[in-house]
Amino acid sequence: MDARLIDGKQAAHECTARLATRVQALRAAVGTAPFLAAVLVGDDPASCTYVAAKQRALARAHLRGETHRLPAHASHAQVLELIARLNEDARVHGILIQLPLPAHLDAARVCRAVAPEKDVDGFHPLNCGALFLAQPGFVPCTPAGIVHLLRRAQVPLAGARVVIVGRSAIVGRPLAVLLASPGCDATVTLCHSHTRGLADICVQADILVAALGKARFIGAPFVRTGAVVIDVGIHHVPDATAPRGRRLCGDVDFDAVAHKVQAITPVPGGVGPMTIAMLLHNTLCAAEYAAGMIPPFRAALYADLDGRAAGDVPH
């Protein structure tokens, strides 16, 4: 069996093109484009790379943005003061807190400081609660991107057995809630480091999502023949054949499972591009909300991504 690649780059390109059309409509209506403010604390190379990639994506979709940099030793007070200013700045529609933060900062406290209507990452407790209660709100970008990839690939969700390996508040837990919600209707098992018999559980999955943060951990014994595999992980691993002596890989051992699965997301080029596309989407929705073009918290997952209206949220 030759696995079908679920192309996140192409999916993100299509989404970005549709977003650009909506940005033009917003400009025509109110004379402004969506504006994303990124907060970067410290100079972690990976975080700097991610922020730069997001800024390039903003430009492609004709959104505006800027990065606010604070030193690694910045205090809670300094970070919260910056966020307060951005909350009050009418030209800013979305605020992104680049994670991880330096160890001395409480990420939950910082994310809570972002105004819910500008929380385009979907990390504020009000947006998390809205997701849990099947109410419209900002959906975290990676789970939103995963569901869009599955739908675009025409993977049946209703009644599907989904196993998610990894229970982070950013991916695993919100994705479990989203996939189990009315409109997706999957049967979801959420696994973690204390799960017993992990391989035996994973091999039952119609859809297996690897989001555990361990390079190439998911091998052939974890995957049922004909399953769909979504790889959320991203790691740099040593590789003497690579130009810089390192290669990107995911949480899945791609070569070990590709012959068994029906479809799989590659790393790179799978989940990552769609995560950024959903960040742009949420930022646009925040701007439309600020302009009075959509009802409060109607910045939901499927608005204008697969031909549905903004109100047709499958909860």
From Swiss-Prot:
Functional note: Catalyzes the oxidation of 5,10-methylenetetrahydrofolate to 5,10-methenyltetrahydrofolate and then the hydrolysis of 5,10-methenyltetrahydrofolate to 10-formyltetrahydrofolate.
Name the UniProt record assigns to this protein: Bifunctional protein FolD
Pathway given in the UniProt record: One-carbon metabolism; tetrahydrofolate interconversion
Swiss-Prot/TrEMBL catalytic activity: (6R)-5,10-methylene-5,6,7,8-tetrahydrofolate + NADP(+) = (6R)-5,10-methenyltetrahydrofolate + NADPH; (6R)-5,10-methenyltetrahydrofolate + H2O = (6R)-10-formyltetrahydrofolate + H(+)
Classification via SUPFAM superfamilies: Aminoacid dehydrogenase-like, N-terminal domain (SSF53223), NAD(P)-binding Rossmann-fold domains (SSF51735)
Organism (species): Treponema pallidum (strain Nichols)
A single GO BP: purine nucleotide biosynthetic process
Binding site for NADP(+): 166-168, 193, 234
Molecular function via GO: methenyltetrahydrofolate cyclohydrolase activity; methylenetetrahydrofolate dehydrogenase (NADP+) activity
Family label: Belongs to the tetrahydrofolate dehydrogenase/cyclohydrolase family.
EC number: 1.5.1.5, 3.5.4.9
Subunit architecture: Homodimer.
Encoding gene per record: folD
